[in-house]
């Protein structure tokens, strides 16, 4: 019965699938991640040697010795790690201040408790070096025995002796370097002696021995040298060791960089050990036992080699310290010429060429493997694949060596402020060795080589399983073919010629490694009897398996074959003379080829070692040198400590800052230079941290080192993401700014010679933005997500800056604000191709504080500017349709205080300094006025809601208080000052007389002190408010028309097509509709959408179609609202005495406005500002709006004082000076204002189409009898008061 699964369980199982990482199309621009996998190490260290009983007993015995020596070498490595990673404990332990201190005993007890385990390590180290020296000297003594001198010693055994020499050199230098070891032991010994822990004589003696051992410089080196000098003939054996190292170095018989450097160190230290009173290496050179010229060339080409970690050594220094040093024997090393290892640029062209060749070959092979499946590749194919793998490992090793050797040379040759001007005088030693010791070209070359190493490592690791299988098959086939086939001929001759030693060696080789088809050697093989094969040949079928030889098996085969071709064989003559030349060549070729098999069989570890650049981070040697202190200023040259009298500051620390760390130096160099060709390599230097952490865990096995790597990675990666995000944002912001920049403006700039970098160069950020799982210290980091978070914040800042910049400027900044937001929108669009950014409109709303509030910062600032600056200080000119700032500030309010925008980087504005200058010039032309561009920008930025809010506030907070406040008070006051009656004088008086008449009657108004200041200012504010609303509506209408035209295609609205004479427009229209049917929103949504979606689409379509068609007008509503504010009786005055119209009485507003118009029509003197300059046309608009809304337009045009003067002057054409007023000039001004008033009236009447005003289309006509002269009214009963007449009729 099947188990029932609930829906909840099923859903949870599905959700788990989200955690599975699926392969994606992420570009590979990072190193090989370190996987946590099980690795099988088949190196048995000769534990299975007893299984090869068929081998020569001598070599099995040698394997036993080998195994013991390897154990000592491993132990020596552990002691080297212990010394190198030793951190001073005594500095962290409190010391008693005086002998009277009460807790002195407690402190000493704790000191002993803490340091005792560490001191035991030092004791074990002392015991180990004694044991290792005894074992090494014992082997040397055994091999230098008179009976053994001519015996064959294998290259593997000589190499092991060389490793011992290297180990002694490393341990000795580490012991010399580590003063913290001595300090800690001194602290322990002082505490132990106080507590009497070391009471017995043996312990005291061992403590004394350890103290002397640690304190004596070069103790291990000198002990080894003294021990060897007591052995007769040791120099011959060491000569063999040195020669094998020279041979292997020159023929590149090594694979990992560590082995290469070990060979060089053995040459130097070996020659130092050989040179003594009894042996002169110069004489050995003369006897051709060693070749100093070859070693001299090696030492010059490789002047400095890594000793251990960040400790370096110049091998030639050993020669300089030797007893018989003769510089003439070392011409190259003694010269002052710089070593080739110091110049990476020399190696770079060859590295590039090798990289391109190998990568193309590897790519071809990879493609072949992935596209074709072969169950059993041929021997030739396996051989080619194995050679490909070997060449790859050799190239990686060579490139890694170049990097580490350059780094080593630089550490040993720090720069100073004389060589590098950028290096400060007070720079630290480590800082001078790393931070300031590389040129920009060297850093780029280093990055490129590291990228090649790590990139090739990734490619090879990807096909590791394929390569390993081919390697095993190839090694198996070559070994079996050689053993079963190639060795038949030398075996036949050895049997035939009765060369028993050669026969026994060859038979041992075959019995040790042959894998016969039937499980045993053919008994009828003629070779065993020394006979020739039959005419048909003797067929041996060699099997083909996917398995390689064991490490002991390979060692036995190679050693026994080497004994056949070696110059030493233990007899009077070498065995090689008894072997045929052709066979000798085959054996020699096999021996050389098989040297690399152990590396290839352990392909994964070898690949990792060949690419290991971990030592570029380690700095234990320099930390030891500085003791974790930074001397900021000390005027005396000496060993600095806390007792320095001239010391200003001394900072204690346990690590160097990241600015001195090579991985970050290289990473930061790419980020600082922004070099496009290097940008895709930026993750490779960070992989050095992976190497260092892996080395700390697997080789050093120190948690604190890993913790320090991790801490630096945390800091560096944060810096990396921050800097990279800023760069990416700046790049795309600059690109957006360049795209948005006016093309004609750019062209004009180029013509004038102002050349700014408009379009940024392509920096290849796209590849980095696609990185979703960067591997760092075992963490999978979504770089895309981290960059997205920061760029989201940058976008918010950029939009915030744009709005803040607008808030810091006047109303003219609205155009620049729109441009900034559009540039940000373009930047957002460009970045959204790679990043999941927040919605741009949402960002704008958030920055504008408009998410929940009805109006945002932009709307608020627009109103603030309107209220405190624009309406009160700007003058409108209908000819240009613009507002400009008034020349004289007549506003009673204080000047508006604007906050300055925050200071931010250039890229937050337009993208770059050059673009900022260009846009400042471009938008500078909009700062001197407020016109159509500004109103269109307001419409687009404020939207319907913002515009409604602004207009509503203008009406409530500006217009209404003005009308019912200051204007009403001024009107009441001036109505009192107006003459009770002011007629229209007859034409017979002439225009000068009419002017004099009005001048006399309107003296109080003309001389009213506040007329041209506060009164006109109030009218200007009112008029500007009305004009603003009108222009906003006009701009909004244009925007809506534009929207309609854009939407027409999606609403099945097409322009009438052009038709020829015989064509029917209906047919062509239908074809157009069919062609664009897929774009029709409503019809498509109705077909494929839900009923609700269809309804929404239809409503949206209807709203779009009829938005302008229904003829809605904001301005009409505003005028009606203003009309509702004119409810005071003073505006209309008392009812006319004649019941019809006030003709001569000055009781209505239009008569007051006529008087005010008379005032501002009076020409000013030459130095005075005109009313137009001071108040603009807002003044005229205010009066005209009030006249129209009060229904007084016709009577104003008929009874206006100025218009009457104009009419009379047109008749008589006179031009006189009437009490200082030039009549002709005044008439000209009146005419201009008359035209302006007419234009304003026509605009207002156009909008007030549905009211009862005098300008309405439908006129309400009332018929009245003609008026009579007052002199005849009393005698005539013809004329009656209309009101009384109505009453009589009603009655």
Swiss-Prot record:
It comes from the Eukaryota. Pfam families: CYRIA-B_Rac1-bd (PF07159), FragX_IP (PF05994). GO terms for cellular component: apical part of cell; cytoplasm; neuron projection; SCAR complex; synapse. Residues 1271-1291 have a biased composition (Polar residues). Transmembrane segments: none annotated. In the embryo, expressed mainly in the gut and in the developing central nervous system where high levels of expression are found in the CNS neuropile. Expression in the gut diminishes as development proceeds (at protein level). In the adult, expressed specifically in the nervous system. The keyword rRNA processing does not apply. It is found in: Cytoplasm. Interacts with Fmr1 and Rac1. Component of the WAVE complex composed of Hem/Kette, Scar/Wave and Cyfip where it binds through its C-terminus directly to Hem. Belongs to the CYFIP family. Plays a role in guidance and morphology of central and peripheral axons and in synaptic morphology. Also required for formation of cell membrane protrusions and for bristle development. Plays a role in regulating mitochondrial activity, energy metabolism and membrane potential which maintains normal gamma-aminobutyric acid (GABA) signaling and ensures normal social behavior. This is Cytoplasmic FMR1-interacting protein. It comes from Drosophila melanogaster (Fruit fly).
């Amino acid at each position: 019965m099947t188990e029932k699964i609930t829906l909840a369980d099923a859903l949870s199982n599905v959700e788990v699938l989200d955690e599975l990482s699926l392969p994606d199309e992420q570009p590979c621009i990072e190193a090989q991640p370190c996987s946590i996998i099980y690795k099988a190490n088949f190196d048995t260290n000769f534990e299975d040697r007893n299984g090869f009983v068929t081998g020569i007993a001598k070599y099995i015995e040698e394997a036993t010795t080998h195994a013991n020596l390897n154990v000592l070498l491993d132990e020596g490595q552990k002691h080297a790690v212990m010394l190198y990673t030793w951190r001073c404990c005594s500095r962290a332990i409190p010391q008693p201040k005086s002998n009277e201190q009460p807790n002195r005993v407690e402190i000493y007890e704790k000191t002993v408790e803490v340091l005792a385990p560490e001191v035991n390590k030092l004791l074990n180290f002392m015991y180990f070096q004694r044991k290792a020296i005894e074992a090494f000297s014992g082997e040397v003594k055994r091999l230098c025995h008179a009976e053994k001198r001519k015996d064959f010693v294998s290259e593997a055994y000589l190499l092991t002796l060389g490793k011992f020499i290297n180990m002694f050199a490393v341990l000795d230098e580490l012991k010399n370097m580590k003063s913290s070891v001595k300090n800690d032991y001194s602290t322990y010994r002082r505490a132990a002696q106080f507590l009497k822990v070391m009471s017995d004589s043996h312990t005291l003696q061992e403590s004394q021995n350890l103290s002397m051992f640690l304190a004596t410089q070069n103790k291990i080196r000198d002990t080894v040298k003294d021990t060897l000098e007591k052995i007769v003939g040791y120099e011959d054996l060491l000569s063999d060791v040195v020669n094998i190292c020279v041979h292997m170095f020159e023929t590149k018989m090594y694979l990992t960089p560590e082995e290469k450097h070990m060979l060089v160190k053995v040459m130097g230290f070996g020659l130092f050990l050989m040179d003594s009173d009894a042996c002169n290496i110069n004489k050995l050179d003369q006897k051709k036992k060693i070749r100093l010229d070859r070693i001299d060339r090696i030492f010059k080409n490789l002047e400095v080699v890594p000793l251990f970690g960040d400790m370096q050594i110049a091998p030639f220094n050993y020669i300089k310290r030797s007893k018989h040093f003769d510089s003439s024997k070392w011409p190259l090393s003694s010269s002052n010429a710089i070593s080739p290892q110091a110049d990476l640029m020399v190696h770079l062209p060859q590295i590039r060429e090798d990289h391109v060749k190998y990568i193309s070959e590897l790519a071809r092979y990879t493609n072949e493997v992935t596209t074709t499946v072969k169950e059993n590749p041929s021997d030739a194919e396996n051989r080619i694949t194995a050679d490909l793998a070997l060449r790859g490992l050799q190239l990686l090793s060579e490139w890694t060596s170049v990097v580490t050797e350059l780094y080593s040379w630089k550490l040993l040759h720090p720069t100073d402020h004389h060589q590098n001007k950028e290096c400060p005088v007070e720079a630290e030693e480590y800082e001078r060795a790393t931070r300031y010791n590389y040129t920009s070209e060297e850093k780029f070359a280093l990055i490129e080589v590291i990228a090649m190493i790590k990139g090739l490592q990734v490619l090879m690791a990807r096909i590791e399983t394929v390569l390993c299988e081919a390697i095993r098959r190839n090694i198996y086939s070559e070994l079996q073919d050689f053993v079963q086939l190639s060795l038949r001929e030398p075996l036949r001759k050895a049997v035939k010629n009765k060369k028993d030693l050669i026969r026994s060696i060859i038979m041992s080789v075959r019995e040790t490694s042959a894998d016969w088809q039937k499980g045993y050697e053919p008994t009828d093989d003629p070779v065993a009897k020394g006979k020739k094969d039959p005419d048909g040949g003797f067929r041996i079928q060699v099997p083909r398996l996917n398995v390689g030889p064991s490490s002991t098996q390979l060692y036995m085969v190679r050693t026994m074959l080497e004994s056949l071709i070696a110059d030493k064989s233990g007899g009077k003559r070498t065995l090689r003379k008894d072997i045929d030349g052709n066979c000798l060549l085959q054996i020699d070729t096999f021996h050389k080829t098989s040297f690399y098999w152990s590396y290839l069989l352990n392909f994964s570890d070898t690949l990792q070692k060949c690419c290991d650049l971990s030592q570029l981070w380690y700095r234990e040697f320099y930390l030891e040198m500085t003791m974790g202190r930074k001397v900021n200023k000390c005027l005396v040259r000496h060993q600095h400590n806390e007792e320095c009298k001239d010391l200003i500051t001394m900072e204690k620390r346990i690590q160097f800052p990241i600015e001195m760390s090579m991985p970050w130096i290289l990473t930061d160099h790419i980020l600082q230079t922004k070099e496009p060709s290097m940008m895709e390599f930026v993750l490779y230097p960070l992989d050095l941290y992976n190497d260092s952490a892996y080395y700390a865990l697997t080789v050093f096995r120190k948690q604190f080192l890993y913790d320090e790597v991790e801490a630096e990675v945390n800091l560096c990666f944060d810096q990396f993401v921050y800097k990279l995000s800023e760069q990416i944002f700046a790049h795309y912001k600059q690109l957006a700014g360049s795209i948005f920049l006016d093309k004609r403006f750019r062209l004009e700039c180029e013509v004038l010679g102002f050349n700014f970098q408009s379009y940024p160069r392509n920096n290849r950020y796209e590849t980095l933005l696609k990185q979703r799982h960067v591997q760092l210290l075992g963490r999978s980091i979504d770089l895309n997500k981290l960059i997205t978070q920061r760029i989201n914040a940058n976008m918010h800042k950029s939009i915030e800056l744009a709005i803040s910049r607008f808030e810091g400027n006047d109303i003219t900044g609205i155009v620049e604000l729109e441009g900034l937001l559009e540039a940000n929108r373009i930047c957002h669009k460009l970045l959204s191709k790679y990043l999941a950014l927040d919605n741009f409109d949402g960002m704008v709303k958030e920055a504008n504080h408009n998410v929940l509030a009805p109006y945002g910062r932009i709307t608020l600032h627009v109103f603030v500017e309107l209220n405190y600056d624009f309406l009160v200080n700007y003058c409108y000119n209908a000819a240009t349709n613009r507002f400009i700032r008034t020349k004289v500030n007549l506003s009673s309010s204080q000047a508006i205080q604007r906050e300055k925008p925050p200071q931010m980087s250039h890229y937050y504005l337009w993208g770059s300094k050059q673009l900022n200058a260009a846009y400042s010039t471009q938008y500078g032309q909009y700062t001197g006025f407020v016109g159509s561009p500004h109103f269109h920008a307001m419409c687009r930025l404020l939207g319907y809601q913002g515009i409604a809010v602004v207009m509503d506030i203008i009406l409530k907070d500006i217009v209404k208080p003005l009308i019912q406040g200051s204007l009403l008070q001024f009107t009441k006051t001036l109505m009192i000052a107006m003459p009770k009656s002011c007629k229209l004088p007859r034409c017979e008086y002439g225009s000068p007389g009419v002017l004099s008449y009005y001048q006399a009657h309107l003296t109080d108004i003309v001389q009213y002190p506040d007329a041209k200041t506060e009164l006109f200012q109030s009218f200007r504010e009112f008029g500007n408010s009305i004009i603003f609303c009108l222009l906003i509506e006009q701009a909004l209408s244009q925007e809506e028309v534009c929207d309609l035209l854009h939407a027409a295609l999606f609403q099945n609205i097409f322009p009438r097509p052009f038709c020829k004479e015989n064509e029917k427009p209906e047919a062509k229209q239908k074809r157009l509709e069919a062609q664009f049917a897929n774009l029709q929103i409503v019809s498509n949504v109705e077909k494929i959408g839900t009923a609700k979606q269809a309804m929404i689409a239809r409503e949206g379509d209807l709203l779009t179609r009829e938005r302008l068609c229904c003829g809605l007008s904001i301005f009409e509503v505003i005028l009606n609202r203003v009309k509702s504010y004119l409810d005071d009786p003073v505006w209309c005055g008392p009812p006319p005495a004649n019941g019809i119209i006030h003709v001569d009485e000055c009781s209505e507003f239009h008569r007051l406005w006529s008087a005010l118009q008379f005032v501002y029509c009076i020409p000013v003197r030459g130095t005075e500002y005109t009313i137009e300059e001071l108040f603009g046309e807002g003044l005229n608009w205010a009066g005209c709006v009030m006249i129209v809304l009060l229904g007084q337009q016709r009577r104003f045009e008929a009874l206006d004082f100025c218009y009457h003067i104009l009419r009379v002057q047109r008749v008589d054409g006179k031009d006189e000076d009437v009490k200082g007023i030039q009549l002709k000039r005044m008439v000209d001004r009146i005419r201009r204002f008359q035209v302006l008033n007419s234009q304003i009236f026509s605009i207002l009447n156009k909008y007030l189409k549905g009211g009862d005003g005098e300008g309405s289309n439908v006129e309400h006509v009332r018929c009245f009898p003609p008026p009579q002269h007052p002199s005849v009214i009393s005698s005539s009963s013809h004329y009656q008061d209309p009101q009384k007449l109505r009453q009589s009729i009603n009655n």
